[in-house]
Amino acid sequence: PCYVIDEGRLTDNLKILNGVMQRTGAKILLAQKAFSAFCEYPLIGRYLSGTTASGLYEARLAHEEMGKENHVFCPAFLPEEMDELVEICDHIVFNSVSQYLYHLPKIQAAKSKKKMPISAGLRINPECSTQEGHEIYDPCGAGSRLGITRAELDRAIANGLDLSQIDGFHFHTLCEQNSDDLEKTLDAVEAKFGDLLYNLKWLN
């Protein structure tokens, strides 16, 4: 197959996104799961803050081809994957407290070596479903194991979790939806986790 990319239109869209960044102070990242045509990474990197990756191979691609902020999330990281991720990523998000604690020694060791320390985050589950028709992969659906609920986080804190070492929260609950559903989800995040947000460095 032949993929034809209109760089003029791509640049126009990138300028719009860059304008949002300039006006708001937010960072906008390329989700490689949706677009990984790395021949365009040098162009994209001129306008966006970096990339998000869903695992080691996407993180490696971003590191090699764009070289900007490199954020990675995966439901579970293998020990051998983490060995490389701490070298090439600056933001690593964990799906559970147990995953975070398991890999914490490598995160701490890498922080002492790297000029740009790794920023560790947790994926949260705001328990606010806005999807219809595809509940089977709704991260906020009943029985979902994607993200940490407030009750689970409270239990971890009661058992000694030091939240001061967590730089940010990440939630990923929308699929082909618009800002109205994002607004509902943000309201739920504030209702469930609002008392913790102001101690964080970032919210993704």
Describe each model-derived feature in a short phrase.
Residues 1-3:
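Generic N-terminal amphipathic, Lys/Arg-enriched alpha-helix
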Residues 10-13, 17, 189:
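Alpha-helical packing segments of well-folded alpha/beta enzyme cores
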Residues 26-202:
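Active-site-proximal beta-alpha core segment in soluble small-molecule metabolic enzymes
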